[in-house]
């Protein structure tokens, strides 16, 4: 089916759904039609704008062919054609992007997990910096940032930390943050002024609902134990810490941040559900195409995606060769949009090239 035929088909379907909704249907049929109608609304607006500009361009080109045109009128028409010819490809691209297969998880909230990698205490300090950066970004976007768990090192670093970030389309914005983030800086404990390189791993998971992943009680092993502090000492006299193991997959989540065993269990189940949902999505994507990448880069958590160089004040994303000399804005204030928008645009361009 050609691009034009596809647009006609979408407009026809939209109009038919509109007539159906106006005919007085009720119940499940009405709910289904309303959902489909709402899903098409955005692309229909773009198609109509594209068709309008395309028609105006054709009219202007036909008008230019008329013989009896004075110079002023001809210049005005040529200017209009110039504007329309520049606008039309942009509108067409917007339509084509809207036609791309949607990631069903894009509209979901997300769970972010940050873990210290190679580099010892400096890596743990960097993990804390990254975690706080995402918290600032969530605040900037108006999302709700709920800390699920933090494993402190005792001097401000995080061995690992996780949070739930709730809001519209959170996962679509943050999914490209998964991977290895590297830092180059002089640690505060470095007396010789030598630059150290360390790393932290970020994983972004779509927050799954019960309808996305069903977990059977028989598939879970739940262990409770006393929570411990950074030095290993017990900090609670009750068995409030929880470890949940999903027996079929072997995935394990342990939580001890809350004093309440019930709260730790609820948070652990939320993380477990997200990890199982992500594994389900990964397997589904692999079955669809072993060769095609569905994210910028491989989406592999072992892939080095970004370097933060404090000495030169720069942040470099290696997947799209973008370097910004504004490390304070990015790290301290969570100004990540320039990276995220470029990553999304690059991903869309790759997908368009595969059509």
Swiss-Prot record:
Pfam families: PCRF (PF03462), RF-1 (PF00472). Keywords: Cytoplasm, Methylation, Protein biosynthesis. The keyword Coiled coil does not apply. Peptide chain release factor 1 directs the termination of translation in response to the peptide chain termination codons UAG and UAA. This is Peptide chain release factor 1. The keyword Nucleus does not apply. Its main location: cytoplasm. InterPro entries: PCRF, Pep_chain_release_fac_I, Pep_chain_release_fac_I_sf, Prokaryotic/Mito_RF, RF-1. It is found in: Cytoplasm. GO terms for cellular component: cytoplasm. Gene3D superfamilies: 3.30.160.20, 3.30.70.1660, 6.10.140.1950. NCBIfam families: prfA, PRK00591.1. The modification N5-methylglutamine is found at residue 233. One of its GO terms (molecular function) is translation release factor activity, codon specific. It comes from Rickettsia typhi (strain ATCC VR-144 / Wilmington). Methylated by PrmC. Methylation increases the termination efficiency of RF1. Belongs to the prokaryotic/mitochondrial release factor family.
């Amino acid at each position: 089916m050609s691009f034009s035929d596809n647009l006609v088909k979408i407009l026809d379907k939209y109009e038919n759904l509109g007539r159906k909704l106006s005919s007085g249907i009720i119940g499940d049929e009405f709910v289904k039609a309303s959902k489909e109608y709402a899903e098409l609304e955005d692309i229909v607006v773009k198609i109509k704008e594209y068709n309008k500009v395309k028609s105006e361009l054709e009219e202007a080109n036909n008008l230019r062919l008329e013989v009896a045109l004075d110079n002023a009128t001809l210049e005005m028409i040529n200017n209009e054609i110039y504007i329309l010819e520049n606008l039309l490809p942009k509108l067409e691209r917007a339509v084509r992007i809207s036609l791309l297969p949607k990631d069903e998880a894009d509209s979901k909230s997300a769970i972010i997990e940050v873990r210290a990698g190679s580099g010892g205490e400096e890596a743990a300090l960097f993990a804390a910096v990254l975690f706080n950066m995402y918290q600032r970004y969530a605040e900037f976007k108006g999302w709700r940032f709920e800390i699920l768990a933090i494993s402190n090192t005792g001097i401000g670093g995080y061995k690992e930390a996780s949070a739930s970030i709730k809001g519209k389309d959170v996962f679509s914005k943050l999914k490209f943050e998964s991977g290895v983030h590297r830092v180059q800086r002089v640690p505060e404990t470095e007396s010789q002024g030598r630059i150290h390189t360390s790393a932290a791993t970020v994983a972004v998971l779509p927050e799954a609902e019960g309808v996305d992943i069903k977990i059977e009680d028989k598939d879970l092993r739940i262990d409770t134990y006393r929570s411990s502090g950074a030095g290993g000492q017990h900090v609670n006299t009750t068995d409030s810490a929880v470890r949940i193991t999903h027996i079929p997959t072997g995935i394990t989540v342990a939580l001890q941040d809350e004093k309440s065993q019930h709260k730790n269990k609820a948070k652990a189940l939320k993380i477990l559900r997200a990890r199982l949902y992500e594994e389900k999505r990964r397997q589904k994507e692999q079955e669809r195409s072993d060769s095609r990448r569905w994210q910028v880069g491989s989406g592999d958590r072992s892939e080095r995606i970004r370097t933060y160089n404090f000495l030169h004040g720069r942040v470099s994303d290696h997947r799209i060769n973008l370097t910004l000399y504004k490390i304070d804005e990015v790290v301290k204030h969570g100004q990540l949009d320039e990276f995220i928008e470029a990553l999304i645009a690059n991903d869309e361009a790759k997908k368009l090239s595969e059509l």
